[in-house]
Every structure is written in C-alpha cells, then in structure tokens.
C-alpha cells in the first residue's frame, strides 16, 4: 500500500472546497480509507469505500471504527474496476481514486469514466508518467512525482 502523502491529501481536499459539502462520494482503491474519511470530516454526506485487498480492508474497517463513522459509510469488498461498471453518475457526486501507480489503473479509470460516467466528477491520483498523451486533456495538478487528474462528466 502506498498511502497518499499528507501534503497531497490536503491539496486535494482543499481543491474540492465546498463541493464536498453534502456530496455522495465513492473512494475507489480505498486502501486505509484516508481520502474517504477526510471527505467525511469535511462534510461529505456519505462515502462508499471500495477495496479488494483483505489486508487493506482490515485497516480500513479499523480506521472507520476508530473515527466512529455511522450509517453514512459503506464498505464494499470488490475490485474497483468491476464496481464502477455497475455505478451510474446519479449514484455519486464525486469519485476519489488512488490506484497503484504504474499498473494502468489510472488510464483505465479515465477511459471508463469517459465511456460511462460513474460519478459527476472523478479525481484520480497517479504518477506523472502513468497516462498516455491522449488522456491528458483534462485538469491536472502536480505535486512532485504525484499528479491529481480531475474530470467532469459530460452533461
């Protein structure tokens, strides 16, 4: 597991600003749940955490229990790429994704989002060399070797 650095997480959440207030959020490749839990602490209405790794799920559930989150939280043990095939734009306002770097997940998420939006907006963290040139036509913010890509669903 490669957790999002505090600096990147703070910049990410600050750039979401008031859009997070009352939002329905999905945290894909949730890992420890840091992004989704931060979204809840900043006013998200609900968060669905999607994680396939049993070890990460144990950590995620412990973190949720530690922070005392209530019924606005759901944990789904599933591969994120399979999960999004069944989600629709009306299901989530914001999708946060922090997939493993260098394995093609960031590209696959962006392509899937363009073909079938599974949220109103997608925010995906990836390494600076993880996207093909043809997939770089959206807002990107760089933090050293880390990039946050933001896409909006077409209306």
Write out the residue ranges for each language-model feature.
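Class I S-adenosyl-L-methionine-dependent methyltransferase catalytic core
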Residues: 1-155
